[in-house]
């Protein structure tokens, strides 16, 4: 289970709005013609398409303050006796709502995230008040639009921003029948669109420029790519890989029986080559860290004699250990650098501070240590000897912890090392504590309001560890997203800071966001694209990518594949997918004359035509000012290194010794092999994934300490 199920179970949970802060400036580029910045004009700049006040807003209602109008609207639907009555009220309001003209029923005015087509237009009139008009091709959705227009047409921009979505929660249950939950989010998405236009009106009134959009890539129905902004251009360069390099790699892989497992966060050049090569050699797999080792085992079973790992060192260590456990000790495992390929998160778990955290856990029985899989095998082994340990991923951590609390009475759970993920888990459980028992049961059937409140003081998380990539999604980036992209689909890795997490969780409550693993993010994008393709109506889907930019290659490949699979004899709608990179101008660097910013020399010529490349001047890949460029450690896995390793295999002259993945012959403080003890928490996780229960051996270890459970 990923955390997206929480939002589905609790549509009434809405994070409080963040306070506005100054936005960041970005290098100029041309905005998307489909969804550019909204032009909102006040008295000094009349609109070429003035909106007349809605006929649905009666004179006596207009005189009321917007807050009272909102309260009356909410009360009307709160006291409505049943869903059928509420639907009748919506249809009656829809009948009174004026239709928009064809000139306003265009892609730029579409409200994303609605089952039906919904259009919203807004402007600031001469009196400094917002004038709204809306329309839909669905009568129920038109009813929701009419509700919002009647409540907020004529309000001052600040009054529109003051509306709390929680105040309109009674509208959420107004629709009945199939797709009711999705259609009921229409009012929420329309409100977000109104508030976006109100912010733009305030900025125009104060003389503040709209600000440059984030860089983005737009994937057309024909698979063509349009890059907007120099950062996006740098990302797009390698999405159409060099055919000669692809052929060279495939030839070597096939002749020498080499398999490749790579993480999503690889360099775009490498991912582009791998994606193209996979069409000719099946033993290439790009994924998150969870399934890299499993994929390597399948490749060994299929006859691969070598596995090359494109990731950080703990990933190659895990591949080596799991292959040994599976009986493939003769299969060679190779890294992509003779130097250490580190990870800030893994380093945090090997610190003395983390050891102190575990010792504290060992003094608080019964305790279970839930450790993020993105840590070294040695760390897992040493931790498991101090406290019974199970690994987790960003997609199963919530289910793992909830099951542990349900299965072991009085348990203390100690999560680490990612501090942001730990804080986000605690935030999730606090949200669950105010849900109904029925809503909680949808998340985990063994829990209710009482059990969630009881476990909160027994959840502990390490507070001094984080991924340098996800650390960069700070408040400045969040403010810009809120200002310009609040109506877009928001995606966020579970490791992002709390502000980005809260913003994405709010979007999840209205079907517009996902918080989870890299695979969860990819699936979210694919699912929304499939829905658009099934509707076969012109559309522009805009996704803010709240994780490492290296995912773009896999996203583009998946989008292109879906576009190809939906080609039919009937006329295809013009559907586009836009991926927005929420990076600051400090998260890119000017190209230099004497350096290629740690890129291979083979790529320097290609970069001559690009003015910036991902990565700040220090070469770390991310900026402390907010926004992520890329993981510097992952970018050590270059195409040149991959080709070098492949060409030199088999390594008869021992020139690749420094590239071999570590095989742990070292022993733990209790005298056991690191590889053996370090693999056990991973095997516990696999058991949980297969059965949805913690293994008896682990439960016995937690409750009784040493020894095996009796059958």
UniProtKB/Swiss-Prot annotation:
Which positions in this protein are listed as binding [4Fe-4S] cluster? 343, 467, 631
Q: Where in the cell is it found?
A: Plastid, Chloroplast
The cofactor remark states: Binds 1 [4Fe-4S] cluster per subunit.
Q: Name one GO cellular component term.
A: chloroplast
Q: Give yes or no: UniProt keyword Membrane.
A: no
Catalytic activity, as annotated: iminosuccinate + dihydroxyacetone phosphate = quinolinate + phosphate + 2 H2O + H(+)
Might you give the EC number(s) for this enzyme? 2.5.1.72
Q: Pathway it belongs to?
A: Cofactor biosynthesis; NAD(+) biosynthesis; quinolinate from iminoaspartate: step 1/1
Q: A single GO BP annotation from the record?
A: 'de novo' NAD biosynthetic process from L-aspartate
UniProt xrefs under InterPro entries: Fe-S_metab-assoc_dom (IPR003808), NadA (IPR003473), NadA_sf (IPR036094)
Function per UniProt: Catalyzes the condensation of iminoaspartate with dihydroxyacetone phosphate to form quinolinate.
Family label: Belongs to the quinolinate synthase family. Type 1 subfamily.
What name does this protein carry? Quinolinate synthase, chloroplastic
Provide the species name.
Answer: Oryza sativa subsp. japonica (Rice)
């Amino acid at each position: 289970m990923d955390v997206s199920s929480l939002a589905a179970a609790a549509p009434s949970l809405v994070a409080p709005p963040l306070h506005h802060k100054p936005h960041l400036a970005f290098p100029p580029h041309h905005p998307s013609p489909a969804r550019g910045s909204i032009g909102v004009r006040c008295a000094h700049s009349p609109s070429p398409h003035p909106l007349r006040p809605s006929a649905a807003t009666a004179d006596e209602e207009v005189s009321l303050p917007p807050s009272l109008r909102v309260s009356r609207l909410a009360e009307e639907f709160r006291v409505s006796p049943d869903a059928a009555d509420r639907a009748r009220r919506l249809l009656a309001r829809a009948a009174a709502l004026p239709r928009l003209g064809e000139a306003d029923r265009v892609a730029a005015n579409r409200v994303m995230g609605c089952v039906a087509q919904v259009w919203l237009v807004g402007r600031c009139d001469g009196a400094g008040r917002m004038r709204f008009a809306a329309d839909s091709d669905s009568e129920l959705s038109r009813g929701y639009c009419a509700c919002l227009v009647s409540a907020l047409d004529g309000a001052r921009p600040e009054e529109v921003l003051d509306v709390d979505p929680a105040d309109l929660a009674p509208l959420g249950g107004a629709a009945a029948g199939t797709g009711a939950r999705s259609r009921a989010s229409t009012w929420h998405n329309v409100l977000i669109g109104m508030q976006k236009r109100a912010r733009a009106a305030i900025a125009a009134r104060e003389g503040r420029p709209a600000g440059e959009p984030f860089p983005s890539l737009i994937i057309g129905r024909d698979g063509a790519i349009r890059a907007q902004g120099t950062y996006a251009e740098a990302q797009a360069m390698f999405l159409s890989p060099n055919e000669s390099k692809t052929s060279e790699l495939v030839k070597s892989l096939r002749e020498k029986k080499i398999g490749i497992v790579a993480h999503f966060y690889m360099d775009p050049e490498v991912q582009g080559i791998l994606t193209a090569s996979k069409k000719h050699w099946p033993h290439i797999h790009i994924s998150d860290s969870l399934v890299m080792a499993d994929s390597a085992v399948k490749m060994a079973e299929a006859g691969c004699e070598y596995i090359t790992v494109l990731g950080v060192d703990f990933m190659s260590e895990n591949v080596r250990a799991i292959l040994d456990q599976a009986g493939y000790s003769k299969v060679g495992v190779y890294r992509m650098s003779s130097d250490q390929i580190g990870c800030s998160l893994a380093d945090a778990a090997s610190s003395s501070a983390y050891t102190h955290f575990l010792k504290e856990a060992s003094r608080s029985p019964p305790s279970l240590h839930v450790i993020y899989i993105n840590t070294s095998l040695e760390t897992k082994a040493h931790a498991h000897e101090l406290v019974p340990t199970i690994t987790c991923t960003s997609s199963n951590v919530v289910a793992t912890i909830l099951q542990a609390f349900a299965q072991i009475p009085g348990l203390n759970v100690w999560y680490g090392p990612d501090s942001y993920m730990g804080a986000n888990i605690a935030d999730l459980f606090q949200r669950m504590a105010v849900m109904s028992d029925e809503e909680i049961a949808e998340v985990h059937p063994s829990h209710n309001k009482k059990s969630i409140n009881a476990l909160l003081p027994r959840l502990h998380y390490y507070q001094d560890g984080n991924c340098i990539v996800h650390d960069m999604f700070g408040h400045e980036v969040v403010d810009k997203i809120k200002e310009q992209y609040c109506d877009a689909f928001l995606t966020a890795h579970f490791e992002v800071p709390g502000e980005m997490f809260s913003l994405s969780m709010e979007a999840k409550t209205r079907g517009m966001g996902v918080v989870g693993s890299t695979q969860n993010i990819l699936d979210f994008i694919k699912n929304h694209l499939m829905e658009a393709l099934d509707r076969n109506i012109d559309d522009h889907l805009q996704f803010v990518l709240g994780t490492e930019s290296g995912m773009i290659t896999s996203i583009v490949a998946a989008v292109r594949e879906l576009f190809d699979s939906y080609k039919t004899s009937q006329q295809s709608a013009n559907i586009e997918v836009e991926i927005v990179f929420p990076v600051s101008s400090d998260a890119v660097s000017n190209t230099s004359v004497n350096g290629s910013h740690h890129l291979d020399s083979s790529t320097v010529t290609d970069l001559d035509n690009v003015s910036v490349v991902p990565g700040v001047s220090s070469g770390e890949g991310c900026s402390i000012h907010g926004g992520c460029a890329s993981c510097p450690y992952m970018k050590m896995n270059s195409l040149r290194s991959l080709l070098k390793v492949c060409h030199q295999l088999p390594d008869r002259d021992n020139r690749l010794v420094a590239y071999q993945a570590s095989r742990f012959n070292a022993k733990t403080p209790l005298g056991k092999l690191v590889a053996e003890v370090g693999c056990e928490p991973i095997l516990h996780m696999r058991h949980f994934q297969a059965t949805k229960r913690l293994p008896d051996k682990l439960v016995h270890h937690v409750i009784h300490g040493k020894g095996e459970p009796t059958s």
